[in-house]
């Protein structure tokens, strides 16, 4: 099969792409992309893995499925493309970021700068139909993204897993807590942010954990883009 990922992830995951479930998922996606409006663009599906090589992962922020509005999703959990209005959950993430470590709120919603520093921004489902949340749930993506979580968990080097909300916290059973750190709270969505997300200080706590491991902390402050 054609190599879909850069070497570091391909070496970990290539066997998955030959399995029957992935072949079925691939056929479904071919039909969906040819007959429906699907997000993100097919070239962006694996951006979480393209921006953050396997050996560079320091932290994981798990999301659910991609944003389903025009121009939003680009393959990174919680992130939107520059020039697109920040969705409510992302606005709340930036409020907590400001309260936690004093970063000013950026003039865009792209989290690429985090991904390039080793933050794996992984959704558990990697595609969605326009305007239909969870439309590709249960189609096979979860098996692949569970395997991604597993190969990260298998690494010797400790990692910080940031789990916001029940959906992400269901993955706790896949994480070896004798080796890795879990930081969790409610989801940053407007429905739950005030019930434990605000004030949870995930960014400073992640950096404190990384420094304790002897790792470079993450510069969470996101630079503004030129207007």
From Swiss-Prot:
According to UniProt, the reaction catalysed is:
Hydrolyzes single-stranded DNA or mismatched double-stranded DNA and polynucleotides, releasing free uracil
- Positions of the catalytic residues: 65 (proton acceptor)
Where does the record place it? Answer: Cytoplasm
Key word Cytoplasm present: yes
Listed under GO biological process in this entry are: base-excision repair, AP site formation via deaminated base removal
Q: Does the keyword DNA repair apply?
A: yes
> Which Pfam families does the record match to this protein?
UDG
Q: GO molecular function of the protein, one example? A: uracil DNA N-glycosylase activity
Keywords recorded for this protein, A-Z? Cytoplasm, DNA damage, DNA repair, Hydrolase
Q: Quote a single Gene Ontology cellular component term.
A: cytoplasm
Q: Which cysteines are joined by disulfide bonds?
A: none
Q: What is its EC number?
A: 3.2.2.27
Q: What class of enzyme is it?
A: hydrolase
- Report the function annotation for this chain: Excises uracil residues from the DNA which can arise as a result of misincorporation of dUMP residues by DNA polymerase or due to deamination of cytosine.
Protein family per UniProt: Belongs to the uracil-DNA glycosylase (UDG) superfamily. UNG family.
PANTHER family this protein is in?
Answer: URACIL-DNA GLYCOSYLASE
Matches recorded under NCBIfam families: PRK05254.1-1, PRK05254.1-2, PRK05254.1-4, PRK05254.1-5, ung
Give the protein name, as stated in the record: Uracil-DNA glycosylase
What gene makes this protein? ung
């Amino acid at each position: 099969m054609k190599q879909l990922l850069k070497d570091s992830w391909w070496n970990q995951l290539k066997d998955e792409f030959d399995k029957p479930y992935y072949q079925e998922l691939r056929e479904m996606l071919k039909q969906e992309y040819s007959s429906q409006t699907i997000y993100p663009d097919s070239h962006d599906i694996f951006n979480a893995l393209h921006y953050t090589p396997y050996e560079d992962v320091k932290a994981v922020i798990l999301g659910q499925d991609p944003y389903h509005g025009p121009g939003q999703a680009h393959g990174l959990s919680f992130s939107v493309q520059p020039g697109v209005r920040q969705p409510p959950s992302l606005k709340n993430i930036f409020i907590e970021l400001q309260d936690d470590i004093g970063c000013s709120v950026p003039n865009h919603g792209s989290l690429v700068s985090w991904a390039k520093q080793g933050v794996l921004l992984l959704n558990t489902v990697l595609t969605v139909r326009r305007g239909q949340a969870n439309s590709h749930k249960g189609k096979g993506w979860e098996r692949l993204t569970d395997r991604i979580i597993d190969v990260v968990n298998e690494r010797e080097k400790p990692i910080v897993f940031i789990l916001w909300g029940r959906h992400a916290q269901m993955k706790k059973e896949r994480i070896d807590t004798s080796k890795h750190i879990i930081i969790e709270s409610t989801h940053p969505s407007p429905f739950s942010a005030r019930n434990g997300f605000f004030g949870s200080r995930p960014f400073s706590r992640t950096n404190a954990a990384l420094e304790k491991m002897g790792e470079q902390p993450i510069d969470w402050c996101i630079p503004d883009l030129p207007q």
